[in-house]
Amino acid sequence: GHQWFDFINKFEPQQEDFYPDRSDVWTIIFTSGTTGTPKGVVLDYQTNENTECLTTPEHNPLRVDFNGKNSFFSYLPLNHIAERIVVEWTCFRYGGTISFTESIETFAQNLGSVQPTVFFGVPRIYTKFQMGILSKFPQEKLNKLLSIPIVSSLLKMVLKKKLGLSKAKAIVTGAAPMQESQRVWYRNLGVNITNGYGMTENCAICTQLPGEITDKPDSVGKAQPEVDI
């Protein structure tokens, strides 16, 4: 390997454009072993090209701004397929900024200051958010406040900003099951969580259930473009 500055000083920038074959290796991602022994999953440029079909003006589950006005918050391991696609690849492909959490202790503070337009969280993160809200607003009290129109609107606005989701156009979960009751709970706060299903082997996303749909318990949504089931 090379240190970054040694790499810059030792190698000249590539002058000509590089056009890989679709069968060339795009990246290798090592899995945690969910489906067996941990292994390096080889993804080629054809897979990457298919991923691009998931974000078009007609089909845009991440609500990406094609003019590059996107903001992402990175906290998962960078070799996690969801982090690689939803945050890294999407930002590199369509433009935007990526902000990184400083530590576990500063996660909430960092997210609150960034207010990303796209946020991906595993279900455990949303459970922690929920527990934090309920520690200050027990469910009975929360229900009462949400039943008062003016108070409800103000409370939803305050909570979304406190969570760091006030500017989020897409709020997504995946990598583990999320209970439908939890998605409904968040929807009552004005937070629509899109549920995605995928694996490292199929480049993160093969189905997705839009956040506004909460009447299909146990569903992971419809197959995405270029996905065969």
Language model regions located:
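Alpha-helix/helix-capping structural signal
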Residues: 46, 124-127, 176-177, 181
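ANL superfamily adenylate-forming
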Residues: 1-22, 134-162
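Conserved pre-ATP/AMP-binding loop-to-beta segment of ANL
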Residues: 11-30, 37, 63-71
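Structural detector for helix-capping/boundary residues
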Residues: 2-5, 23, 46, 76, ...
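Conserved AMP-binding A3 loop
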Residues: 26-53
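Conserved AMP-binding/adenylation subdomain of ANL enzymes
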Residues: 49-74, 78-158, 167
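Conserved AMP-binding/adenylate-forming
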Residues: 119, 155-229
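Conserved S/T- and glycine-rich ATP-binding loop of Class I adenylate-forming
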Residues: 25, 31-34, 72, 77, ...
